[in-house]
Structures are given as C-alpha cells and as structure tokens.
Amino acid sequence: MVNGKGPFRFIVDTGATHSTVSPRLVQALGLQPSEVPTMVLNGITGTAQVSAVTLDRLQTGDLTIDQLVAPVVWAPVMAGADGILGAAGLTGRSLSVDFQRNSVRISRGVEMAVRGAALKIHATHVAHGLMTLSMEVGGVRGLAVIDTGSERTLGNPALREALKLRTRTGTEALVTSVYGATEQIERGEIWRAPTILIDTMRINDVQVVYGDFHIFKVWEMQNTPAIIVGMDVLGTVASLGIDFKNADVYFTSSRTNTMTFTPAANLSNTMHK
C-alpha cells in the first residue's frame, strides 16, 4: 500500500539501496516532488540525476516506512512494476522469498526466513542495507552480493583478470548488452565460471557476465574480485531468507543441479570475511 491506496506491485531488490517508484505510480497517486526535487541514482551501468517524490507511507507485510523520499525511475529492469523496494528499507526486518509459490514476505522476526532452511551463511554489512558474502571461484577469493533485482550473475574486471579467462580458455567471449536503472547500456562478456564456493554452497555451471559495471565502483569493489549473484542462480533454490538485522542469509535445497550445499548440520556454522 502507498499512502493508504493499492495494492501496488513492488520488486524487492536486495542489491538496491534506494527504493524507487515508477512514473505511472506518481501519476496515479498525484505524488508531489520532494523538498529535494532531484536525486543522484546509481544503477548497475551508470548514474543519473532523476526527479524525486515523497511517499507519506509505504506499507507491506510488517514493514511501514513513513516520509520516504523515492527517485522516480522508468527502466526495462522495472519489468512493469510500480516500484522497487531497496535493501535500506528492510533494515531490522527479515525477507522470505518462496520461489516455488512465487511469494515474498517481510516480517519483524526471523521465523519465516529460517523456515525449512538447510544452510545459514553470515554476511557482512557494508552500507544502506547492502551485505556481502565471502566467496571463492576458481581458486580466487572475493566478495559476493546477493541481488534479487539482477536478472543475471555479474562479475567485475578484477575477478575476470584474476581468473585469466582469456589466456586460460584461448577463446573469445560472447558479448552482450547489460541494462540497469539508468539509460546507460554497458558491454558485457559472457564466460562460463568455474565452480563458485560460498561457505559450503557450490554454484555450478553458471555463465557470468563480466564488465566494468558502474555499481562496483559505487560499492568500492572495483579492485576486489567480486560477483553479483542474480536471479539466474537464486531462482534455482526453493526459497531464500535474509535476516537484515543479524546479517544472516538462509537457503533451502536447490531445485536443480546449479546449486548444491551441505544441509541442516551447517546451520550452526557461520562464515566471516
């Protein structure tokens, strides 16, 4: 619900800091510009100066945010949604995503996030709700960001060079275009990644899109091997839970061979970078 009206469709994006709204929602509710009429929006591929509006109240599940200043964004990544709920708005809450039932729940407690989980991984808070996990791929250690708003899994140049993909394979990469929340379109190279290890979780047979993506600079990860784990991987598990208060991420069993991990007993273990 927005300003007591709705419901409206929002995408929960754990890789976004700001919550955003679409021009369609602004028009439907007659939202007025905020006291700060424009904001700098940082997306995967670039930055933009965009208009901003103030939501008197945003409500979903156990979450209520008052006087939310939100950038107004239209982009292909919105996928027809009315807005995006960013990680900063989930501070102190738990997120439970059930991919089998196509449902998302936000709650104050961790019960929904933990339910049925086979693996718990402790993360590190970075800023504005963003969390990173320690990972290893092809013998290279780095950082991983769980991003429910990214369609594909992305890697930065530091990881690509550390893996020496060009010299190791002796082949040329497939080239693709990567779109974000801003108008910039970035070039990406598609390489099949070695097995990605996050705690006891093994992510197999994943095509990673590597590029000099703007967001890695925003997160100050441009010099550290890093990946953004997108929905091409996350969508293979039965459910995903994130406890934003305690920085814990929970996974249930995978529905495919893409992701495997040691079950249940590992719930008592955590991993710090």
What are these regions (language model features)?
Residues 1-273:
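Pepsin/retropepsin-fold aspartyl endopeptidases
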